[in-house]
Amino acid sequence: MKKRVMILGAGPNQLPLIKKARDEGHFVITVDYLPENIGHRFSHHYVNCSTTDKEGVASAAQQLSIDAIVTTASDVAVPTLSYVAWLLGLPGPSLQTAHFMSNKVQFRSFQQKNRLECPKFIHSDTFDDAWEKLQTLSMPLMFKPSDSSGSRGINRVEERDYSLCKKAFWNSHMYTRSGIVCIEEHIDGIEVGGDGFMSNGELVFCSITQKFVRWFVPVGHRLPTNIAMEDQIRLREQIATACKLVDYNNGPVNFDVMVSRGHITIIEMGARSGGNGIASLVKHATGFDVHLATLRNSLAMPIGKVPDCKKTIRGCGSMILGISQNGILETMSSAQELKAEIPQVFDCNFSVSCGDIIEPFIHSGNQIGTVTFSCKDESDYAQITACIEKKLSIRISTIKTNDEPLSNISSHDQDFSCNLKNALSVK
């Protein structure tokens, strides 16, 4: 008998999970406030509702008699997932767990209270109050919306300048629902990402990626990671400890961590799997299917055999695609053409078609697809991504806008002067 699985979100990042649920023979219900989102084309039924509308999603879930509810790549959907799971008695993170893990201010407070490594921070809903509080922080500063995801609204300010800080504050404020901005000291180090899985209170799997970032937006990942084994061990211990302290015992966990000499600092940790092709990358490199484990866990089924996450069966990488300016997509190679041209490519997910309006790649929500491929090392990664960019043959017609850049602020929400090659190069 088919299980009715509700998936929160129907964008490009949710598409692989939607396809996996279909492949497993489930009746798939997608929830999203954008009817044109690509994931709806692959589900059996869709609900036109925001994933942050707890009561709206709960009402639909009850009417449709769902058996499970999941999401991926979306922190903002986790509180809704938790609420519906609690209401219907389904597996999912607790309300308290979702509260701490989906809000940057709450997560920093949780880290501070439990004496976990974290940057010094303040938060406020008005700039004048924030300006007074941030005098206690050391420069440079990171401005972040407290309850957004996908790298939206993140700004870095180098100088304690009133005008620059004000611009950064209100730019981050645009992306909040609560109106609260989190301001924290910048941490130097090597930034890594990855996916893990909790089962019966234990971190049974944890794959750590090398992460490539441009203006705080991920543009790619690679396995194996680029940090030492001793740091990998310490990182896994930190993730396991944080999950236990926040009472997260079963389900996927996505993380971004800064690794520096003597310090492992969790930047973000979500009660869901990651987007940007990480699941495909992890499966190819380790043999562990994060999406399949997520679906099985949501249906109260055993997640199956878990491989040794310290071993990489084969090296591979992912490339997140985006355009540096507004435009109408005129031409782009198909997935089949790209695979034929580049034999290392084994997975392509494109979320746009010719004729679509493309927005600048200033956050993960504006990506146009992901490509996953085999690669030996970082040098090989750079060569293959350059080849992919060339073979994609992307051409757009420009749309003029009157947007003004945020000068002197390091922000992915300023005007992108870089071209596609620079945006996707290895940093």
Show where each model-derived region lies.
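Short, well-ordered beta-strand elements within core beta-sheets of diverse protein domains
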Residues: N155, E185, K283, Q367-C375
